[in-house]
Swiss-Prot record:
Belongs to the prokaryotic/mitochondrial release factor family. One of its GO terms (cellular component) is cytoplasm. The gene is prfB. The modification N5-methylglutamine is found at Q250. It is found in: Cytoplasm. Pfam families: PCRF, RF-1. Peptide chain release factor 2 directs the termination of translation in response to the peptide chain termination codons UGA and UAA. This is Peptide chain release factor 2. GO terms for molecular function: translation release factor activity, codon specific. Keywords: Cytoplasm, Methylation, Protein biosynthesis. PANTHER family: CLASS I PEPTIDE CHAIN RELEASE FACTOR (PTHR43116:SF3), PEPTIDE CHAIN RELEASE FACTOR 2 (PTHR43116). InterPro entries: PCRF, Pep_chain_release_fac_I, Pep_chain_release_fac_I_sf, PrfB. It comes from Chlamydia abortus (strain DSM 27085 / S26/3).
Length: 368
């Protein structure tokens, strides 16, 4: 009997049809055709920035269409083997089908999550910043651990990872780091991580092996294009230059190429030392500044939506959102959703972070 597999196949077929409509495949194919025609024009590469964005969009569209087509073939193959194969008499076939069903159901779950990401900038690349809280070396080490977790998580999503700014700790770890994630729905997923992350563990830096509590704050803001107008007056900016910090090398600490820009009315400060030239670092800083200011607009909208709701949900971006306990027991628990896991190693390897993000989106996706 394979009645349970029949029901799972029915669920996949229904999900396939819904995914096809929600992904607007026909619209994506038309957009792809138009963009590919643009690349054939002689003056396409005259505006390198614009051409780069078009090329990135083409890659994204091709990936989304191919992903759907591959999924469709997998579901059709499942239907074929389920209808034509003798599943009940072939345990090995059933085991293979079970594995394939699990993979397809996971893919479908990813698409269902993306349906919650309907915000105007959810599809955009994003900047993620981690800052050490009080606690000195402990907190700096915690920042480095979180940085590693997010980079591994981004790799699983096949996002491009660029370190924009990084300040090493005095003894170990990282005081501050800003990284850019570029890929499909990077901001939509990463926005769930905004807030304070708390670590409880026996410190490797304490010879008395006492338990320590460390804090790190995470901020996430979307990269926005020039079509979104953000009013930034030159007179409101303070621009400082300084020497890049790092492990050394020919281009480190030689010239004042790193740039820090402060928006005086809001106090927002951004810095970049990734590029070798001051001009390039300044351009990167302005992108981050526009993104941070746009994030403020989004936050104000969110607060208004929360006030308008009868059943107000508490979201405070500056508040503690997740606890990571390594000793005396192992537990990672999200304060907002209650989602938890005891497998802290898999969590810190980025393997379970999606589960926490999905729980957040299921709870708050409609208003975030």
């Amino acid at each position: 009997m394979h009645e349970s597999l029949d029901k799972r196949l029915e669920g996949l077929l229904t999900g396939l049809a819904l995914a096809g409509r929600s992904l607007d495949l026909e619209g994506k194919r038309q957009e792809l055709s138009i963009l590919e025609e643009q690349t054939l024009k002689e003056d396409f590469w005259q505006d390198v920035t614009s051409a780069g964005k078009v090329s990135e969009r083409i890659v994204s569209l091709k990936r989304q269409i191919a992903h759907y087509e591959e999924f469709k073939v997998r579901v059709e193959n499942l239907a074929f083997f389920l209808n034509d194969g003798d599943v009940s008499a072939d345990p090995e076939l059933r085991e293979d089908l079970e594995k394939e069903f699990t993979i397809c159901e996971h893919i479908l779950s990813e698409w269902e999550t993306q349906r919650l990401l309907s915000g105007e900038v959810d599809k955009n690349p994003c900047f993620l910043t981690i800052n050490a809280g009080a606690g000195g070396t402990e907190s700096c080490d915690w920042v480095e651990m979180l940085f590693r977790m997010y980079c591994r998580w981004a790799a699983q999503h096949q996002w491009k990872v660029e370190v924009i700014d990084r300040q090493e700790g005095d003894v170990a770890g990282i005081k501050h780091v800003t990284v850019k994630f570029s890929g499909d729905y990077a901001y939509g997923y990463a926005k769930a991580e905004r807030g304070v992350h708390r670590l409880v563990r026996i410190s490797p830096f304490d010879s008395n092996a006492k338990r320590h509590t460390s804090f790190a704050s995470v901020d996430v803001y979307p990269e926005i294009d020039d079509e979104i107008e953000i009013d930034i007056r030159p007179n409101d900016l303070r621009i400082d230059t300084f020497r890049s910090s790092g492990a050394g090398g020919q281009h480190v600490n030689v010239t004042d190429s790193a740039v820090r820009i402060t928006h005086i009315p809001t106090g927002i400060m951004v810095s970049c030392q990734r590029e070798r030239s001051q001009i390039q670092n300044r351009e990167s800083c302005m992108k981050m500044l526009r993104a941070r200011m746009y994030q403020q607009i989004l936050q104000e909208r969110l607060e208004k939506q929360l006030l308008d709701r009868k059943n107000k949900k508490e979201i405070a971006w500056g508040s503690q959102i997740r606890n990571y306990v390594f000793q005396p027991y192992t537990l990672v628990k999200d304060v907002r959703t209650g989602h938890e896991t005891g497998n802290v190693q898999a969590m810190m390897d980025g393997e379970l972070l999606d589960d926490f993000v999905k729980a957040y989106l299921a709870e708050y996706g409609e208003i975030s």
